[in-house]
Design a protein with these regions (language model features):
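Short, Lys/Arg-rich, polar N-terminal cytosolic tail immediately upstream
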Residues: 1-11
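Membrane-water interface segments at the C-terminal ends of transmembrane alpha-helices
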Residues: 9-44, 53-166, 190-215, 219, ...
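Short glycine/proline-centered loop/turn elements that form peptide/ligand docking sites
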Residues: 168-172, 278
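The alpha-helix within a helix-turn-helix
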Residues: 176
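Glycine/proline-centered hinge or cleavage motifs at structural transition points of membrane proteins
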Residues: 179-180, 193
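Juxtamembrane non-transmembrane "cap" segments at the membrane-aqueous interface
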Residues: 219-228
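Transmembrane alpha-helical segments of integral membrane proteins
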Residues: 231-234
Length: 280
């Protein structure tokens, strides 16, 4: 048994590599998360509950969650369409379009926020068109927040679904077509079940990123308490007031929400994979 266990450790320096990995993860992830708990411990349980459930904080939760959810649903649809076009069609400028998907990753979020704000204010061409034609204001409203979150979240869906579409075997689609299945039926019953786990993963990552987004939203949100104030901005306001205990308490709630989202994502992906495999 001892010899067998030794053979399993095929990577040279396994102990050292594992130690370095744990140290890096502790420095980057575990220690900062523990610091949130330590700072929030300065409040009593009653003070903690009062802080994280105050009307202004609850209103910021509502704005953050609703706009993040709306943007992520839009990204799920748009991201699937963009990934489908990039994989299934050939057209001039395809590589340029494919590369532009990465722009939200590379572009500083503050730059994105400023650009979106200038593009959607009532004095701009686009913002003025929606304002005067439809009576819709984009900048400094929840619509503007959603637009910013769509911008920063769509690459997560596209890059999650695109590799799966590229690896799909076209023989199944051909067989369905030969058997008389329509394109819509083939997509719903052949293609969509295969890409569903990737779509769920992309949606969840976009939602988690949108929930904590600050830089691109702060300029276009308007930041009006109870209306367009997002939770990350409220946390920043508490820090500027040197109210570190309240800031970390609110951040701890957002952290718990993020972990819950990741847990739900793992469960949904597992169930989707089992359904596709015919286990359930």
């Amino acid at each position: 048994m001892k010899q067998r266990r030794k053979k399993l450790r095929v990577i040279p320096g396994f102990g050292l590599s594992l130690g370095i990995t744990v140290a890096i993860l502790s420095f980057i992830v575990i220690i900062p998360l523990c610091s949130l708990v330590v700072f929030s411990a300065h409040l009593s349980p009653a003070e903690f509950i009062q802080t994280v459930t105050s009307p202004r904080v609850l209103a910021s939760y509502k704005v953050s969650f609703l706009t993040a959810l709306t943007a992520s649903l839009i990204n799920a649809v748009m991201g699937l369409i963009v990934a489908w076009v990039l994989v299934r069609y050939e057209f001039p400028g395809k590589r340029i379009l494919d590369g532009m998907i990465e722009v939200p990753f590379a572009l500083p979020t503050a730059v994105a926020g400023i650009a979106l704000t200038h593009m959607t204010v009532d004095t701009s061409v686009i913002g003025g068109f929606f304002h005067h034609t439809f009576g819709i204001d984009i900048a400094y409203t929840r619509t503007g927040i959603t637009l910013a979150l769509v911008f920063i979240g769509i690459p997560f869906v596209v890059r999650s679904v695109q590799p799966v579409l590229e690896k799909l075997d076209g023989q199944f689609e051909e067989a369905a077509s030969i058997l008389g299945a329509t394109r819509g039926y083939t997509f719903r019953h052949v293609i969509f079940p295969e890409i569903l786990p990737a779509l769920i993963a992309g949606f969840t990552m976009a939602f988690a990123r949108s929930l904590g987004e600050y830089g691109s939203v702060v300029f276009i949100a308007g930041n009006t308490p109870y209306e367009t104030e997002i939770t990350p901005l409220l946390i920043m306001s508490k820090l500027q007031e040197f109210d570190y205990a309240s800031a970390t308490s609110i951040a701890l709630v957002m952290l718990a929400a993020a972990f819950l989202i990741l847990l739900i994502n793992a469960v949904l992906q597992s169930r989707s994979s089992k359904i596709i495999s015919g286990i359930e």
